[in-house]
């Protein structure tokens, strides 16, 4: 929950001086990207900007305190402030910030600016006390903010120091409005107005001017003079003498003598006790002081001018002036040292009662009360965990002595889950083992339910580490004892069980487990696991050969991403990548490439090493188009990423696929042989990951003429794929078997497996898998089409594949261009009939398409002419070639190509 007072613009104080000259300057704020009000404490920065902001509905206000150095907290409040300013316009950014579902602050701000692109009115964001920010991550994000904010959005920063935000650059480009100490110092006229409002007896102009000069227009000093004069019934001149030459660093003694010592003991104690609060309301005051009239007390102090401000229009929330707050806290530590821990405990209890556990934790830490901190964590830690307050939880757990943590095994479990959620996978087992050993040493008993929760986490760790047997045992054991109320651990254990079945190739068992995981995760709003379950379902359906069903499952996942604002999570890249894989399989290459590039955009906010699979996907798209240069450029990027990085074997398999295909297309046997010597040979090919790597190996073996070895590999792959019903893998394997048999001159076997592959492709929709095999595939498909033995659906697919090969790989059709024809006609062995009665360029094109297996309608579509025109071209070229039907024309074209040195 966000504290409302931090998002409320300060209410104008009574008797404030309206500073018209400065307000006139602020009137031009909308013309600048940044307005910076930068001067020491006590010059009236907040009061001035609050005057200017009065009546503006399109303005958000964010009051900082020390806790806002946590990037997640900073982001939540900043977005909330802009939501208030825009009337709730930035719904998606708000959801991302609340759930912490963004890759970085800059990525979140980028989304914010997208949403604000259709907000056309001026918009203002005030951030008060920016000097409290010391986190470089936030500074860097705010530099991004200033570079990219919309033209109609102005940022107003109030700070005691110059913020490290590239101010000089903004100044040079005239995008900065600055106001400093010289501008904010009170003028003689403003000082006169100030004293007239506060003193019973009016002050002469020359006296107020002299006082103003003596304190150099410092508003706080003027306020202290007036306060001291009222409290001691002395003249303002006498009070001023005490302040001569005084500045903010020497205020403490003065405030003791002239402020604290002039209030009664009860009021003094009230002020000191309240100082532990960064903001306060009646309920909190009652907790700290035991007085029932807290609100009345605060209002009375405000009337006395004791540096206390209302923080919102409702008048419910108050805070001390920053200078006075710092002074009071120092005095509290001095005068109430023994009472201070109890005050922080009372404050923590007050915040808990109001429903703000994060603020309560701040006070428990300040009290060094580990028992209270432990109790807060036991009650609220999992809620904070599910709201992604990971940094705060880590601070709390680090503050707890380990023996206290171990005495509460739930906190030991939380610590391990925290490491898991922060992707510190290598630490999780270490934390669990240490906790187990400590609990054994201290004879701490863990009940069976909690042990099951530990098992669920251990199962997740095991599957991440590639240990499916251990993961299955732990997940099964966990599900035996987990009650329905332990929903998170049940989701984890169910997900792991499904993933284990997936890894073992038990797809019929894996799919319902992942569907169950999705339903449970949606019911309990664990949307990360719901998305993960959908991704797993899609991969399982792809493996089963149901690519259309997988595509529709991905649509559900995209819908979940949009609804729950998961766009910036790495899992969104995973979704885009497997969408790209399906689109590539179907030869929708432009869409496949777009999806991979969208994935790279998401990964721009993460380590470059994570880009490997998307870049490999781009290489595959280029290979399917026959664009070897572009494919090579992508693969060089992959090589850079692979160098010196330890990747999971599944990642390596996906990166190796385009490499071995590229070596096949370019005939680079040297690189292929070196890779084969070095690559890891996986174990049993019981899932599509293992099948993929063994296919890479078999492809290289075929390239190197190691036909017997390749046949052994492919026979085993096909046997496993049939047994486990890995239909897509079987489809891919058969295409490699076809290439093997073709190279071995076993044409009958090659044709048999190709026909089975075409039949399976009616289910999978595969096209590009055929296309990348190039000319050898084209020749075989032409022969099958000419035999006219293929069923209609397979025949249509074969013609589509041929068209793609011709389009992307410039095979037979490309040979009948003008240069080829010129060389053909001057060849000494060219038939005399063709030499004396040459075909037109268009007729040569038609002959090439006939040879490629195109029907008349397809030729008409390819050349964008009427079907009747194509019939005329065919009749003419038959006459010139001296042939009577299509089969003879194909044979004639084949002979011409062979004569010119092209294999037929």
UniProtKB/Swiss-Prot annotation:
PROSITE patterns: HTH_LUXR_1, HTH_LUXR_2
Keywords: Activator, ATP-binding, Carbohydrate metabolism, DNA-binding, Nucleotide-binding, Transcription, Transcription regulation
Entries under NCBIfam families matching the protein: PRK04841.1
Domain HTH luxR-type: 832-897
DNA-binding region location: 856-875
Protein name: HTH-type transcriptional regulator MalT
A GO biological process held by the record: positive regulation of carbohydrate metabolic process
Gene3D superfamilies membership: Tetratricopeptide repeat domain (1.25.40.10), Winged helix-like DNA-binding domain superfamily/Winged helix DNA-binding domain (1.10.10.10)
Subunit structure: Monomer in solution. Oligomerizes to an active state in the presence of the positive effectors ATP and maltotriose.
Domain of life: Bacteria
Native organism: Serratia proteamaculans (strain 568)
Family per record: Belongs to the MalT family.
An example molecular function term from Gene Ontology annotations: DNA-binding transcription factor activity
């Amino acid at each position: 929950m966000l504290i409302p007072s931090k998002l409320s613009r300060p209410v104008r104080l009574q008797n404030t001086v309206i500073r018209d000259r400065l307000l006139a300057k602020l009137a031009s704020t909308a013309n600048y990207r940044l307005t910076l009000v930068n001067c020491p404490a006590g010059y009236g920065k907040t009061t001035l900007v609050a005057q200017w902001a009065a009546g503006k509905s399109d303005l958000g206000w964010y009051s900082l305190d020390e806790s806002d150095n946590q990037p997640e907290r900073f982001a939540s409040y900043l977005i909330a402030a802009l939501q208030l300013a825009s009337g709730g316009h930035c719904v998606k950014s708000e959801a991302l910030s609340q759930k912490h579902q963004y890759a970085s602050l800059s990525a979140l701000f980028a989304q914010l600016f997208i949403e604000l692109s259709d907000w056309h009115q001026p918009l203002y964001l005030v951030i008060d006390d920016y000097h409290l920010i010391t986190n470089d991550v936030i500074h860097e994000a705010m530099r991004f903010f200033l570079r990219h904010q919309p033209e109609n959005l102005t940022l107003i920063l109030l700070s005691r120091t110059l913020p490290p935000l590239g101010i000089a650059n903004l100044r040079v480009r005239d995008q900065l409005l600055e106001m400093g100490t010289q501008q904010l110092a009170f003028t003689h006229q403003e000082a006169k107005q100030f004293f007239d409002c506060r003193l019973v007896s009016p002050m002469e102009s020359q006296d107020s001017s002299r006082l103003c000069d003596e304190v150099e227009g410092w508003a706080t000093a003027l306020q202290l003079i007036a306060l001291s004069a009222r409290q001691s019934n002395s003249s303002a001149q006498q009070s001023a003498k005490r302040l001569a030459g005084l500045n903010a660093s020497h205020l403490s003694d003065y405030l003791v003598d002239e402020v604290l010592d002039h209030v009664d003991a009860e009021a003094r104690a009230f002020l000191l006790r309240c100082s532990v609060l960064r903001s306060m309301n009646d309920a909190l005051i009652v907790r700290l002081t035991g007085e029932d009239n807290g609100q009345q007390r605060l209002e009375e102090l405000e009337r006395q001018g004791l540096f206390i401000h209302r923080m919102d229009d409702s008048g419910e929330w108050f805070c001390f002036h920053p200078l006075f707050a710092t002074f009071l806290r120092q005095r509290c530590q001095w005068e109430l040292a023994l009472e201070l821990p109890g005050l922080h405990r009372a404050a923590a209890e007050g915040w808990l009662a109001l429903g703000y556990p994060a603020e309560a934790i701040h006070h428990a830490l300040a009290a060094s009360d580990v028992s209270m901190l432990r109790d807060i964590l036991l009650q609220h830690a999992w809620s904070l965990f599910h709201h992604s307050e990971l940094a705060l939880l880590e601070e709390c757990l680090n503050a707890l002595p380990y023996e206290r943590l171990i005495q509460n095994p739930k906190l030991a479990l939380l610590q391990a889950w925290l490491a898991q959620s922060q992707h510190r996978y290598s630490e999780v087992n270490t934390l669990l083992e240490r906790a187990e050993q400590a609990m054994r040493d201290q004879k701490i008993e863990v009940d069976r339910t909690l042990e099951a929760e530990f098992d669920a986490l251990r199962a997740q760790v095991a599957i991440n580490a590639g240990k499916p047997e251990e993961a299955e045992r732990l997940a099964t054991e966990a599900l035996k004892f987990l009650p329905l109320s332990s929903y998170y651990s049940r989701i984890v254990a169910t997900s792991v069980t499904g993933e284990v079945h997936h890894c073992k190739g038990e797809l019929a068992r894996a799919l319902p487990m992942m569907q169950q995981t999705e339903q449970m995760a949606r019911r309990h709003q664990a949307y990360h696991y719901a998305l993960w379950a959908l991704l797993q379902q899609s991969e399982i359906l792809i493996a089963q050969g149901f690519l259309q069903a997988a595509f529709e499952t991905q649509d559900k996942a995209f819908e979940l991403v949009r609804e729950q604002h998961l766009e910036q999570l790495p899992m969104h890249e995973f979704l885009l990548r497997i969408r790209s894989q399906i689109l590539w399989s179907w030869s929708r290459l432009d869409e496949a490439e777009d999806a991979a590039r969208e994935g790279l955009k998401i990964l721009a906010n993460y380590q470059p090493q994570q880009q490997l699979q998307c870049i490999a996907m781009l290489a595959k798209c280029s290979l399917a188009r026959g664009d070897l240069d572009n494919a090579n450029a992508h693969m060089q990027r992959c090589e850079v990423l692979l160098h010196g990085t330890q990747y999971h074997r599944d990642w390596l398999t996906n990166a190796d696929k385009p490499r071995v295909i590229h070596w096949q297309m370019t005939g680079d046997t040297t690189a292929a042989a070196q890779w084969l010597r070095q690559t890891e040979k996986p174990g049993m090919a019981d899932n599509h990951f293992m099948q993929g790597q063994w296919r890479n190996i078999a492809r290289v073996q075929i390239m190197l003429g190691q036909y017997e070895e390749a046949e052994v590999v492919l026979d085993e792959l096909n046997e496993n794929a049939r047994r486990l019903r890995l239909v897509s893998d079987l489809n891919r394997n058969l295409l490699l078997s076809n290439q093997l048999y073709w190279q071995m001159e076993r044409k009958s076997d090659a044709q048999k497996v190709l026909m089975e592959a075409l039949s399976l492709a009616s289910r999978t929709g595969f096209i590009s898998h055929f296309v990348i095999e190039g000319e050898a595939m084209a020749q075989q498909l032409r022969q099958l089409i000419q035999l006219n033995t293929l069923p209609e659906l397979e025949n249509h697919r074969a013609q589509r594949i041929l068209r793609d090969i011709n389009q992307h790989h410039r095979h037979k059709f490309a040979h009948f261009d003008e240069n080829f024809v010129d060389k053909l006609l001057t060849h000494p062995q060219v038939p005399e009939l063709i030499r004396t009665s040459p075909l037109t360029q268009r007729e040569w094109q038609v002959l090439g398409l006939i040879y490629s297996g195109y029907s008349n309608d397809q030729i008409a579509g390819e050349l964008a002419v009427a079907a009747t025109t194509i019939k005329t071209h065919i009749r003419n070229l038959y006459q010139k070639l001296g042939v009577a039907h299509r089969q003879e024309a194909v044979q004639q074209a084949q002979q011409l190509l062979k004569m010119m040195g092209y294999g037929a």
